[in-house]
Regions:
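Soluble sensory domains of the PAS superfamily and closely related sensory modules
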Residues: 68-73
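PAS-family sensory/regulatory domains
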Residues: 45-56
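PAS and PAS-like sensory/regulatory domains
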Residues: 12, 75-77, 84, 89-93, ...
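Output-coupling edge of small sensory domains
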Residues: 17, 96-98, 113
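Sensory modules in modular signal-transduction proteins
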Residues: 1-31
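PAS/PAS-like sensory domain cap-loop motif
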Residues: 33-44
Length: 119
């Protein structure tokens, strides 16, 4: 199974970014990501995930994501993100690096899962 097929068939919101391009933009996303965020595919592809950040997003948690990306290591972080309509949602974000056969970084795969705040 190719990575793009995996992402599009994943049961959770998922994206692929390309760190070889300026600003590590999203190059693939699935329908669940679009449903979760309220954006269209055209609004997502080519952008860095920062468009989901808003006033309540914790800078320390964002730094955890940035540090893991810079170190090319997997990470899971819960943070407050924002949908296109401005509504916040608690998001469990998993990011993992993708390496080619020569161990060169070629991308990151990310999954997003809305975390319920109800007890």
């Amino acid at each position: 199974m190719r990575l793009a097929e995996f992402v599009t068939s994943a049961s959770v919101a998922a994206i692929v970014t390309d760190p070889r391009l300026p600003d590590n933009p999203i190059v693939e996303c699935n329908d669940r990501f679009l449903e979760l965020t309220g954006y269209s595919r055209e609004e997502v592809i080519g952008r860095n995930c920062r468009f989901l950040v808003g006033p309540g997003t914790d800078p320390a948690r964002r730094k955890m994501l940035r540090d893991a990306i810079e170190a090319q290591r997997p990470v899971i972080v819960e943070l407050l993100n924002y949908r296109k309509d401005g509504t916040p949602f608690l998001n469990s974000v998993m990011i993992a690096p993708i390496f080619d056969s020569e161990d060169s970084l070629v991308g990151f795969v990310g999954s997003q899962l809305e975390v319920s705040t109800e007890e």
